[in-house]
Amino acid sequence: MDGDISTGKMASPACAMAPLDSMEVLDLLFDGQDGILRNVDLAESWILTREEQKVLPNSDSDEFLNSILGPGDSDPSSPIWSPADSDSGISEDLPSDSQDTPPGSGPGSANVAARCHPSKQGEGPCPSYLPSTACPEPPRTQVHESSVAIDLDMWSTDTLYPEEQAGSPSRFNLTVKELLLSGGGGDLQQHPLAASQLLGPGSGHCQELVLTEDEKKLLAKEGVTLPTQLPLTKYEERVLKKIRRKIRNKQSAQESRKKKKEYIDGLENRMSACTAQNQELQRKVLHLEKQNLSLLEQLKHLQALVVQSTSKPAHAGTCIAVLLLSFVLIILPSISPFTANKVDSPGDFIPVRVFSRTLHNHAASRVAPDVTPGPEVPGPHKGSSGGLSADWGNFLEIPMLDDPTEELDNTTLVLANSTEDLGRATLLDWVASEPLLGQMGLEIPGEEIWLSWVPRWLRVRVVQDALGVL
């Protein structure tokens, strides 16, 4: 009975924890003069279960606080509702409406309903030491093990230095949304201060709404005024989302315009470079065209000069003279009158006559007619060959005499004797050589060619015929 009463007394302060901070809760519970638990024997009224001993086996203060805060926790099977006064700022969850709001009169009633549990069945409103609303009796369910474990090792400094810790801000800036989405007791155990804020959000839990200059300008343009403290209403959240969406669109448009401007600037630079290059190429083309025109003019001038030099007609007389000269140069080596003059030159060669033995024998038996000496010295006649003079020199032996008169007589005598010795056949052979050649129409360079060309038997026959004619 005493345990139930003490449990009821300790459960009632949980209803008043909503507007209080953690340090105020400790002062309210353990104050020696005005504390709620100043007359309660804690060592006899709390009996720890085996499960609680497994969770916190080595800390008496942990067992005490777990036993205090355990009945005040909400049932795990009950749905978790996000409080309306949450500090989540701009909500990015699914769109919420009036159906998402838990049944209740307001934020205060939701917190009280979640944290107030009567100690006995059938009791009325929860007793509280601060003004608060009445808590409706929830359906009785089986109380499970607390899903919130508070580590008091971090609170030991609070009890030792309450003034320093009261002024210091919370080291965990987790929102209610993040704690609810975590969905596990381990996260709450890792962040005990955040769990205490979730259980009882106080005045220090509120955050300021920080707006940029662009947001303020757009809000002023829209004619909407937002509060400086979170949380915001759904309408205010929608307005703030709309403003921030406009700012993002504006920034993206500015970025796109900036990129477009940079791209256009690059194109303009390239265009200017291409224009300068095009102008340079045009100047080169004009220069080349001028050079081409000058070359064409020079070519036309040269063509005119060539045409003037080749336009004169060739005379017919010149062509005929060239043809005759060519013909003469071709035919000249085979023309005989030119070769006769060459043969008549005395220094070319000396012909040698060979007399046949047969003619010598016949000549010795013949008697040559008397030759009448004349005033002229006998010798070769005109038109005779040089070989005749040579033969005459062989047969004439004129001795050298002292007296010129005797020389003339002796010369005549020697000539007569030589004529007799030579014979008629030899003389006829000499005389008949030139007429025979003239009759045959053969004009050869010398007699040696005639002697070498005519066979011996034919030569004898010709000589005999010549003698018969004479």
From Swiss-Prot:
Spans through the membrane: 320-340
Residues glycosylated per entry: 410, 417
InterPro entries, per database record: bZIP, bZIP_sf, CREB_ATF_subfamily
PROSITE patterns: BZIP, BZIP_BASIC
Pfam families per record: bZIP_1 (PF00170)
Region (Leucine-zipper): 281-302
Region of interest (Basic motif), residue spans: 241-270
This protein's GO CC annotations: endoplasmic reticulum; endoplasmic reticulum membrane; membrane; nucleus
Domain bZIP: 239-302
Gene Ontology terms: biological process: positive regulation of transcription by RNA polymerase II; regulation of transcription by RNA polymerase II; response to endoplasmic reticulum stress; response to unfolded protein
Annotated membrane topology: Single-pass type II membrane protein
Post-translational modification note: Controlled by regulated intramembrane proteolysis (RIP). Following ER stress a fragment containing the cytoplasmic transcription factor domain is released by proteolysis. The cleavage seems to be performed sequentially by site-1 and site-2 proteases (PS1 and PS2). N-glycosylation is required for optimal proteolytic activation.
Keyword Disulfide bond annotated: no
Cytoplasmic side: 1-319
Subunit structure, as described in the record: Binds DNA as a dimer. May form homodimers. Interacts with ATF6. Interacts with SYNV1/HRD1; this interaction leads to CREB3L3 ubiquitination and proteasomal degradation.
Record's protein name: Cyclic AMP-responsive element-binding protein 3-like protein 3
Gene assigned in the entry: Creb3l3
